[in-house]
């Protein structure tokens, strides 16, 4: 029923092309298109604007950053039930780091929708990832947390984010460090800096 309503809304909208492009990325038609347009506006556009005309994606970027961390934490918590906090935190940091978000923005085609005065904004080290965060913030305002989770689960995990590969890289870090140190003839010392004791 929701899909039918969204499609009818799409048919009678004045910006079908933009909605269609967003649907290819999101997997659903957006409702509040204006918030997605704002998510794709880089602050460089404000150079020639004044007063209330100034608008950019930085507030949505702030919101999206928090939502992404929550969604990824949620997904990892359920995907790896036997893993400790340190492992989950390490894997999450790799997924949400700037280089990963830049890659997601490029692979999903989001970079083609970004509005910026920078000619080569696709190569800027911040713009694509920031826009991706803002996009997730827009999804949250438009549809809520569940749809942000769905976006990651159905559109990103597996296709653009290989959880098993990221987890394996984390599991193998210690062994790779030892292997590298032996090759370079360095001595690596592992020292216990803390221990959690649970009372029974």
Segments and roles (model prediction):
Residues 1-200:
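Double-stranded RNA-binding/processing signature
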């Amino acid at each position: 029923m929701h899909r039918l309503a969204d499609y009818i809304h799409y048919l009678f909208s004045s910006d079908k092309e933009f909605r269609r492009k967003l649907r290819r990325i999101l997997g659903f038609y957006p409702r509040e298109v204006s918030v997605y347009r704002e998510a794709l506006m880089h602050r460089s556009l404000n150079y020639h604007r004044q007063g209330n005309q100034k608008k950019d994606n930085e507030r949505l970027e702030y919101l999206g950053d928090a939502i992404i961390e929550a969604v990824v934490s949620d997904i990892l918590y359920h995907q790896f039930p036997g893993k400790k906090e340190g492992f989950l935190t390490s894997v999450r940091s790799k997924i949400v780091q700037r280089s990963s978000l830049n890659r997601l923005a490029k692979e999903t085609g989001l970079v083609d929708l970004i509005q910026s005065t920078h000619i080569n904004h696709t190569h800027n080290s911040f713009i694509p990832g920031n826009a991706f965060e803002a996009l997730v913030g827009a999804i949250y305002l438009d549809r809520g947390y569940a749809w942000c989770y769905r976006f990651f689960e159905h559109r990103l995990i597996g296709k653009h984010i290989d959880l098993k590969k990221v987890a394996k890289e984390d599991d193998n870090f210690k062994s790779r460090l030892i292997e590298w140190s032996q090759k370079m003839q360095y001595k690596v010392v592992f020292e216990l800096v803390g221990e959690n004791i649970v009372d029974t």
